[in-house]
């Protein structure tokens, strides 16, 4: 599994780390890739997850949108994981993100994984690890 993410404060990267732990516990080989280092081949893995903080008014980071747009043809028909962090709001960015990918025939595992601010307690950490397991199952 490749985990491709953008993190401005470090929260989304922390979420990615716990998703990685969950996927590894389920037996997957995992590589974490910052979106600025990702290329077209980064989505060739059996499983792919994308991470973004909510920016502006509940929006996916432009860096992640641009990357997915550049590889969307390779993702069509594929199932991906989505995760992110938010500070305020209800996490609407995730449901909108899922809807946008659905239009491109890209299905998402569950309802994504949203963490308010940082994965800084046992419940949030476990949620991330379980999502990592779900992506590779």
Please identify what each model-predicted range represents.
Residues 1-3:
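Extreme N-terminal starter segment of soluble prokaryotic enzymes
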Residues 36-40:
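Short acidic active-site motifs
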């Amino acid at each position: 599994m490749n985990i491709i993410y953008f993190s401005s404060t470090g929260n989304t990267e922390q979420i990615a780390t716990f998703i990685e732990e969950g996927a590894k516990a389920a037996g997957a080989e995992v590589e974490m890739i910052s979106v600025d280092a990702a290329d077209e081949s980064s989505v060739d893995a059996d499983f792919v997850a994308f991470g973004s903080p909510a920016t502006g008014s509940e929006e996916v980071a432009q860096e992640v949108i641009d990357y997915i747009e550049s590889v969307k043809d390779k993702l069509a028909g594929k199932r991906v994981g989505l995760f992110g962090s938010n500070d305020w709001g209800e996490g609407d960015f995730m449901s909108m993100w899922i809807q946008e990918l659905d239009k491109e025939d890209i299905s998402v595992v569950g309802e994504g994984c949203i963490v308010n601010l940082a994965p800084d307690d046992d419940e949030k950490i476990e949620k991330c690890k379980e999502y990592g397991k779900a992506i590779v199952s």
